[in-house]
Amino acid sequence: MKQVVMLTGIGNNDRGTARLASELGRTILVQDGPIAHEEVWENGVRTYDGPEIHTHESRLIAEATFGFMGIIRNIRTYYRLTRGEKSDVILTSAYVQTAAGLWLRAIGKTRKVVCIVSDYLPPTGSLSLRIHRRITGFFTRLVARLSDEAWAVSPRIPTVKVNPHHFVLPLLIDDNHAPVTGREEIGYIGFPSPDHAIDLLFEICRKHGLKLNVFGDSAYLQSIKHLAPPNTVFHGITNDTSKIGQVLARCFCGYAVYRDTSPNSYSHFGVPSKCLQLFANNVPVVTTNTAHFTQTIASSGAGCVVEPVPEQIERAILDIRARYPVYSDAINRLRDSWNAGVRQFHRERISALLEATPAPAAQPRS
């Protein structure tokens, strides 16, 4: 049986990719981030679902060492889960996991490595931040070039173009069959920073008596928690899609607003992965014109694209509450059309990677 191993972080619906990959070979998913988690998928069915373990590695230490311990940790996890057996393909995200995959390829533990690049951080800000981003950018370009293929979650990410076999990876939108009734709350998923404008959401929810659910955490969120309405529920960091889905099934609106909508913002280059989880539970989203995927949200009617100002955000939230069934139907149509392309991409690319002697691949998409 063919075997695929995924060494990833959390947030980009890696489970969806694992499910699609498992239709072509047994797939082991290793998620290594604020939460460590492992799964095994076979023929589109999850056969093992490991516990969620909150990691205690300091982000500051991880950044100072450029993720070196993460490379070692991913290699050790690979050996433990595969019992040292060889895999056919390793799909990785971030330079840390890709470096681990490239080492495993070098010693003969896998045939192919795919580097998945989820974001691009422009070297802007303070001097120390610019230096750090230039170094991590160099590492990402290096591992992308050395991989067999490089996939970017957005066509705006330039990093993967160092590899002649680069593609744009469309991410799956799940369907959790959430009910369309009983939608009275608002949901937010993420690691809040001042750019996320969650303080504006606090004000709007307080004004209209809306219950807000917050998944995620950050030092910034802790510093402004006192501004939240008293009925706000802070669920913390979790990777359990079932728990998240139970809450989002009560939400009529999701929030993905960014203050910085310039071409130099990190959100301009990535994909608003929180929107995928919201859409999986038929939750329309209020967002700003940042990522390339935002154009799809606007054209499909699956949400409202606004400027990051309170009046427009408030108006959009109230419109979604008043016309939720219209937005929900738009999400269903978007999911059907979008996922057809997602399945085709995974079937074509993973089949080619699993072949002993790969057939000529389709022309890479820039």
PLM segments and residue spans:
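N-terminal subdomain of nucleotide-sugar transferases
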Residues: 1-43, 85, 149, 203-208, ...
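An aromatic- and histidine-rich active-site surface loop
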Residues: 13-15, 70-77, 89-109, 117
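Membrane-proximal helix-turn-helix segments that form the acceptor-binding/catalytic region
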Residues: 79-83, 99, 106-107, 115, ...
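Donor nucleotide-sugar binding/catalytic pocket of nucleotide-sugar-dependent glycosyltransferases
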Residues: 137-178
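Conserved donor-binding/catalytic core segment of Leloir-type glycosyltransferases
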Residues: 178-196, 201-207, 212-213
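Nucleotide-sugar-dependent
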Residues: 196, 238-277, 287-295
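A charged, aromatic-enriched C-terminal amphipathic alpha-helix characteristic of glycosyltransferases
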Residues: 307-311, 321-359
